[in-house]
Amino acid sequence: MTSDDQPPRRFPQPWMTHFLAALFAVSAVPAIAGEVRISGFTAVDLRWFPQSPKFDGQFSGVETSVVINPEFRYKANGGRLQIAFIPFARLSGRDAERTHFDIREAYVAQRLGDWDYLVGINRVFWGVTESRHLVNIINQTDAIEDTDEEDKLGQPMINIGLQKDWGRLDVFVLPGFRERPFSGSTGRLRTKETVDDDQAVFESSAGNAHVDFAGRYSHFIGDWDVGVSLFHGLSREARLPIGAGGRRVPHYDLITQAGLDLQYTVDEWLWKLEGIAREGHGDPFAAMVGGFEYTFFQVADSAADVGLLAELHWDGRDEANAPATSFDNDLFMGARLALNDVDDSQALVGSVIDLEDGTVSLFVEAERRIGDTWKVEAEARFLVNTDRRNTLAPFERDSFVNLRLARYF
């Protein structure tokens, strides 16, 4: 529904939207001799929840799923013309909502002098910090993939960029809003009340067909990397009040957000900051995350590098009127290991500590290639000392270990 209780104008079903965009992207470019590259991976994931579920209906034990993520890329005219088509699919044996298909990218991109043009579906990343990307607002989070908000849905867009000595300027027209997916009734990592996507409310008479706009200026100034961004459109975060039927109903507010990302590089230090100011969720508010990464290179005369990370979070939103967040007053600490060996072995460990109630979130991520075509990945996430008032309280029994075996081609 829209905010004025009128039936929403729904954007076409996701698969149809993606198909039409991909068809347009491929058919809009004449046949030009160039380079075609086909790559990607298939994988099997085993996700184990060691604790019994907190809510009725949730599965327990192991979730087995299969991932298919091919990439089709075409380049011509020395790379000035590019076409990409990257679909993604997951088939889950335990949660029907986690079985899903998406087109991550399907676009035509053309460079003409200092200008770049892109039409289609794409993923755009903004940000510099490790533990949270406040300014990264173009794409919707694929929340059923993982809890770290790193996985993103493809976003239909028109992107025009200009590269000059004084920096880069990008403008985005974003037609068609992507709603955030949520776990189903049998799934883990959900609230007690399941989410009713069919009743989603949009603060726009156009419903999820609202056209959003965004822009970003970025530049290198000495040892500084600077990014300034502006976004106006439907929030990628949803408020989740309980509806008349006892289920949570997503509310997507119309917001305006200004963002700043900074990175300062000096010797072994990386100093990082992301900050936003947003209006549209009740009172305007600001939020920031900032910290550092210090790297010890070639530890003990080996090829390995070790990085130490620390970041402080603050978020001034009023959660009575804004989407909930667990990063209101938190400290992140972590360490990164890169062996720099032929198998590209690396690991990241970290914790996020709530400085107000003591809730601790721990994680470990590691990966290593096996030969030329295989890779094994491990991920573990644990909640410790969870306060019942914390936003993460519904997930207190959802600590998990995920193992992936992937074959690349």
Q: How does the language model describe each region?
A:
Residues 268-354:
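Detector for outer-membrane/organellar transmembrane beta-barrel domains
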Residues 36, 72-76, 109-112, 121, ...:
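Residue-level signature of outer-membrane beta-barrel architecture
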Residues 292, 395-409:
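Outer-membrane beta-barrel "beta-signal"
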Residues 72-189, 222, 385:
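Outer membrane beta-barrel
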Residues 36, 78-83, 115-117, 166-169, ...:
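Repeated loop/turn-to-beta-strand initiation elements of outer-membrane beta-barrel proteins
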Residues 44-52, 82-93, 104, 141, ...:
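Transmembrane beta-strand segments that form the barrel wall of outer-membrane beta-barrel proteins
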Residues 58-66, 99-104, 152-156, 163, ...:
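Residues that define the transmembrane beta-barrel architecture of outer-membrane proteins
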Residues 40-42, 83-85, 119, 160, ...:
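Membrane-embedded beta-strand positions of outer-membrane beta-barrel proteins
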